[in-house]
């Protein structure tokens, strides 16, 4: 096991506090002209390891599959069934897939990415007004939600907003990206309901099963900004983790960096023009009793000269009150395949996930029977 060198002059707690109190995030560091990554962002080399060469039996696993959703209007039952089978295989083996012809216009995707850039590239004084660690706020701008609990900080800033089930009031959102956030989240909600129909059928259930379980009821939007990193081999954009959602819809940038971990190996996710990246979250793995899997993933530090942006929309009600208990779906368990997880509320799962932070271990282990 690697031992981290201890510097007696390095006061991590003080440096974290000083960084947070600037209220300008990683973007503020870059704007100030830093040429070295501060120690609070240094990750152990074991966490930064580059992908090992694939053994011969895994060479066929190039990357996550890309699935055509037919504009969400399958006129041909065979094409719909083919898409369901592709989703079934991807959700069971990868937990990730890209979708094209998904029904969200390319123009809207570009406007959403521009909205993220516009917010993060405002003046520091304007951004500071939104910076907070009060997680009860509707709109939140900060750097690293787990800054004070994670082993190392990530080279990334984020703004987040709960978009459903309670739609935010216009005055809750920054004017610079207000309209596009509202419109984009509506489109993602519609796409999510459609995907949950296909996922239900892939499980052998009625099309409305997962939607009736309120899997598509809540939506949390996280808009990430990854500034160029002067020493990308020392840190990460996002640490290794799995998502505490039912499903995540990710709008990526042309600048690549996302990697998915499968069978002990890291796979790059390539840019596919106009595609959205879909991944199974922990809660969907839990209720499907491991029929679908929530794989760990990470984002490498940005080596480009331009900032990388992404928008992750998580289908979950998070820490908002929701008394419904979630456990393995009754139709998916039997004497031969008993429940593997205990029941939990979404709030309890999210609270445990947030307290644990992005430490490279799955929160699902805590809920195993």
Curated annotation (Swiss-Prot):
GO terms for molecular function: dioxygenase activity; metal ion binding. It comes from the Eukaryota. The keyword Protein biosynthesis does not apply. Fe cation binds at residues 241, 243, 297. The keyword Oxidoreductase applies. Residues 217-318 form the Fe2OG dioxygenase domain. One of its GO terms (biological process) is biosynthetic process. SUPFAM superfamilies: Clavaminate synthase-like. Keywords: Iron, Metal-binding, Oxidoreductase. Pfam families: 2OG-FeII_Oxy (PF03171), DIOX_N (PF14226). Its cofactor is Fe cation. InterPro entries: DIOX_N, IPNS-like_FE2OG_OXY, IPNS-like_sf, Oxoglu/Fe-dep_dioxygenase_dom. Gene3D superfamilies: B-lactam Antibiotic, Isopenicillin N Synthase, Chain. One of its GO terms (cellular component) is extracellular region. Belongs to the iron/ascorbate-dependent oxidoreductase family. This is 1-aminocyclopropane-1-carboxylate oxidase homolog 3. It comes from Arabidopsis thaliana.
